[in-house]
């Protein structure tokens, strides 16, 4: 999940938070870590209850498990990192419908042990976090001349388009192209 099956650069999953929250490296890292928390926790729980869940209601049960951890995450973030919680806003509850989580629950956690599911969640979560942090860092640097909110270039440096929505598409496209080029080499 970190490199070969990176959810962002290879599988192209989770594009809504990828494009919407990566205006800075800190935001990308925050969203990635939040998603990783939910992914690990939901993978382990789904792996533990897989034999108790009838096939007919499997997907709704998985969504309830994921939503429960997202709700817990929201409360924790609101209490301990309110600035990041406010910045990420609507994208936190949207973790529930992130196809990475439901995909890993269905494809991996429902068929494997809790320990294997933990490591699957960790790997996919790290891959997602790394990708969002890199994309956020590229956009922040090109858009403002900063990285992790530390000025690296003069104040008048920056291309505004990279902190706006079109910049997300442009930067993501180039990063995917670089990953594809490196895979072929």
Where do the language-model regions lie?
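Cytoplasmic-side transmembrane-helix entry/capping segments in multi-pass membrane proteins
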Residues: 53-66, 87-93, 117-120
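N-terminal membrane topogenic signal
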Residues: 1-8
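Hydrophobic core segments of alpha-helical transmembrane domains in multi-pass membrane transport
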Residues: 14-19, 35-36, 40, 67-74, ...
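Structural signature of hydrophobic alpha-helical transmembrane segments
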Residues: 25-41, 61, 85-96, 166
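A glycine-rich, hydrophobic loop/mini-helix early in the fold
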Residues: 35, 39-76
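C-terminal transmembrane helix-loop-helix hairpin of multi-pass membrane proteins
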Residues: 116-185
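Transmembrane alpha-helix boundary signature
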Residues: 72-87
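C-terminal ends of transmembrane helices
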Residues: 42-55, 102-112, 178-182
């Amino acid at each position: 999940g970190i490199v070969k099956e990176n959810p962002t650069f290879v599988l192209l999953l989770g594009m809504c938070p990828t494009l919407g929250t990566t205006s800075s490296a800190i935001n990308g890292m925050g969203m990635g870590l939040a998603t990783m928390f939910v992914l690990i926790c939901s993978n382990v729980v789904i792996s533990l209850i897989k034999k108790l869940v009838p096939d007919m209601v499997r997907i709704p049960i998985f969504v309830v498990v994921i939503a429960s951890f997202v709700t817990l995450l929201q409360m924790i973030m609101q209490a301990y990192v309110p600035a990041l919680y406010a910045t990420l806003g609507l994208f936190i509850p949207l973790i529930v419908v992130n196809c990475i989580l439901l995909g890993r629950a269905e494809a991996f956690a429902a068929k494997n042990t809790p320990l294997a599911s933990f490591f699957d969640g960790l790997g996919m979560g790290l891959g997602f976090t790394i990708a969002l942090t890199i994309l956020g860092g590229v956009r922040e640097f090109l858009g403002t001349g900063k990285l992790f909110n530390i000025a690296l270039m003069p104040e008048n440096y920056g291309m505004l388009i990279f902190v706006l929505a079109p910049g997300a598409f442009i930067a993501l496209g180039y990063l995917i192209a670089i990953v594809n080029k490196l895979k072929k080499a």
